[in-house]
Amino acid sequence: MPTYTPKAGDTTRSWYVIDASDVVLGRLASAAATLLRGKHKPTFTPNVDGGDFVIVINADKIAVSGDKLTKKFAYRHSGYPGGLRKRTIGELLEKHPTRVVENAIIGMLPHNKLGRQIQKKLKVYAGPDHPHAAQQPIPFEIKQVAQ
């Protein structure tokens, strides 16, 4: 009997909601990336998008350990010569808190077509409200050690 290989349409996708209040950014990102890829499922296949949808709320209340707020930078480039811009993570958290969380999670996903497809299942919101109540998301709690 041949080995069972799941196809993209074979998986049932769940919706998870993660509250980012006082959760360390890297721990949140690795947990969300695991759910998005489907690595928590017994039918995980690296070349198939079998993951779940993830909603992250309260992105503006994320915790960043150490002195990363002032010493870690987020870079972006306009595409023109001399168009490299950098901001500290603290500045970016004030203006666009969702972008900090999105970049951390996307950095832990594959950097190819499959990764871009998986990114579409990530929804990040700065406040406690989200428009996905109809999907009945399951609360996902990140267990963390005391800081």
UniProtKB/Swiss-Prot annotation:
InterPro entries listed in its UniProt record: Ribosomal_uL13, Ribosomal_uL13_bac-type, Ribosomal_uL13_sf
Molecular function via GO: mRNA binding; structural constituent of ribosome
Cellular component aspect of the GO annotation: cytosolic large ribosomal subunit
GO BP, sorted A to Z: negative regulation of translation; translation
Gene3D superfamilies registered for this protein in UniProt: Ribosomal protein L13
N-terminal signal peptide: none
Keywords (A to Z) from UniProt: Ribonucleoprotein, Ribosomal protein
Subunit architecture: Part of the 50S ribosomal subunit.
Similarity-based family: Belongs to the universal ribosomal protein uL13 family.
Function according to Swiss-Prot or TrEMBL: This protein is one of the early assembly proteins of the 50S ribosomal subunit, although it is not seen to bind rRNA by itself. It is important during the early stages of 50S assembly.
NCBIfam families: rplM_bact (TIGR01066)
Protein name per UniProt: Large ribosomal subunit protein uL13
Lineage: Bacteria, Bacillati, Actinomycetota, Actinomycetes, Mycobacteriales
Gene giving rise to this polypeptide: rplM
